[in-house]
Amino acid sequence: MYSLARPFLFSLDAERAHALALRSIDTAYRTGTTALLARRPVPLPTPAFGLMFPNPVGLGAGLDKNGEHIDALFALGFGFVEIGTVTPRAQEGNPKPRMFRLPEYQAVINRMGFNNLGVDALVANVQRARRTGGLLGINIGKNKDTSNEEATSDYRYCMERVYPLADYITVNISSPNTAGLRELQEEQSLRRLISDLRETQEALSAQHGKRVPMLVKVAPDLNDRDIDAAARVLADLAVDGVIATNTTVTRTLVANHPLAAEAGGLSGAPLLGQSTLVLRRLRARLPESIPLIGVGGINSGADAVAKMAAGASLVQCYSGLVYRGPQLIGECVNAIRRRREAPSGGAVSPL
């Protein structure tokens, strides 16, 4: 079905096509025709962060920024859906156009800039959702006009608002589309921010009588020294998990494309190699008690297996859905299932 719709969607501006695709998924859900878009995968229960995921394939943050399509997305067969990034106050994001397809490379460049309706709107949407079929992650960020020195207050506010509703919370400090945000990944800044948020997490756990895991999402553009420093901080502070990775600002593999000079984060197939290297290095540097989610460049079941081989417990798709459609979900689940059933038992590949 998606192969028939794709030529029309690709004739539209990328952001307009994005909105239309979400409306179509909603329509299919309301009319009970989601099965025409994707066959729901057979469950593949997967433990991580003290939770049990129906299957290890999730939706990465950014597709449903405001939590307006949760039930329709679960109906496609995701084991978990991550909504956001959400900020304390609504913001429009960067000027349009701000999303670009690179079909020759099965890639996307975006500079959305955390456009969202604000955390209160997201909370209202989550409260209305039925949420059957999977676990819900909520990705939080800071407003663009909040300085890095004051960033903790934005993250804390969002965490307090979404904590009762989230199955896990992701702290996004790695988007390239908010000026200065990635500076929060520097060792001392990271330690201050995550230390404060761990204290908030523990206080909220006592207040609500449940512990919601807190994950940190990192960039693929960190050098080995920065990765090692981040791993030390995240291990010292005992975060619940790490998502590797966000989009990249490098253009090496798409340098000849006419859109390569567009500002923003590059995602899709060209990101697979670098994001998986970061994932593998983090797995080698972090204790086994901190699971990883692998994301970046997954366009096939084999790509998902590569993430698992590099040390991921779960994987997420986003740009791959633009090119492959919802069938990618089941393909990834089935490929991971075959890997689990293999005699090797799915050992992590060495550095």
Swiss-Prot record:
Binds 1 FMN per subunit. It is an enzyme of class 1 (oxidoreductase). Monomer. FMN binds at A61, G62, L63, D64, K65, T85, N139, N172, K217, T245, G268, G297, Y318, S319. The gene is pyrD. It is found in: Cell membrane. CDD domains: DHOD_2_like. InterPro entries: Aldolase_TIM, DHO_dehydrogenase, Dihydroorotate_DH_1_2, Dihydroorotate_DH_2, Dihydroorotate_DH_cat, Dihydroorotate_DH_CS. Substrate binds at K65, N110, R111, M112, G113, F114, N172, N177, N246, T247. Its EC number is 1.3.5.2. It catalyses: (S)-dihydroorotate + a quinone = orotate + a quinol. One of its GO terms (molecular function) is dihydroorotate dehydrogenase (quinone) activity. The active site is at S175 (nucleophile). This is Dihydroorotate dehydrogenase (quinone).
